[in-house]
C-alpha cells in the first residue's frame, strides 16, 4: 500500500500579501513625489545629516532660521562697510536676533525725535530689506541720563518712545509693511550701553536699536 505524501501549499499567508501590497503602494507614492518635485540638495543633505546625527526636523528648521539671520546680518554689514557707516551704526547677532544699533546723530538732533533727511537712505535700505523677510521688528529708543524737560518731551521716557515710534512710522509710511510686525519701546536712560561718565559714553547711550527678531526667541 502506497503511503500518501502530504502536500504543502506554497501560497503565503493572506496577511503577508496585504502587507506586501501596502509596501508597494507606499514605494510608488514616494517615487511619484520624488519625480514631481525638484530636490534642493543642500536642504536634503541638511535633513539627512541632522537625522543621522540624532537630530530632528525641528532642529533642521531652527538651523535654517539661524542661517537666514546670518545672511541678513552679512547683507547689512556689507551695506555699512560700502557706505562707511560702521562708526555710527553697529550690526550684530545675539539671542534676540539681528540687532542694529544706530547712534543718535544718524537720525536725530539732540533732544529731538524728527528724523533727519541724512538718515533716510539707511531707513530706506532697511525698508527694502524688511519687505523681503517675514520677521517681526522691534525698535527701541534709548537716551543718556541727562534729564530733559520740554513741552514735547517732559522726560527721557517720552523722547525715547517718540524716537522709536518715529522710525516705525517712517518705515510703514514709505513701504508696504504691516504695522502688526512692529513694536516700539522707549527705555529712557534705563539701559545704558556704557556708564554715563564721559561725553563719548553719553553719545553711545543715545541710540536707537532695531531688532530683527529671531522666530525661535519669540
UniProtKB/Swiss-Prot annotation:
Q: Tell me the compartments it is located in.
A: Cell membrane
Q: Where does the record place the OmpA-like domain?
A: 95-216
Q: Quick one: where is this thing mainly located?
A: membrane
Q: Which domain of life is it from?
A: Bacteria
Which residues span the membrane?
Answer: 15-35
Q: Any ranges marked Extracellular in the topology annotation, and which?
A: 36-218
Provide the alphabetized UniProt keywords.
Cell membrane, Membrane, Transmembrane, Transmembrane helix, Transport
Stretches assigned to the Cytoplasmic side: 1-14
The membrane topology term of the UniProt record is: Single-pass type II membrane protein
Q: Which GO terms describe its cellular component?
A: plasma membrane
Give one Pfam hit by family name.
OmpA
The family assignment reads:
Belongs to the MotB family.
What does this chain do?
Answer: May be involved in some transport function.
Q: What is this protein called?
A: Uncharacterized 24.6 kDa protein in ccpA 3'region
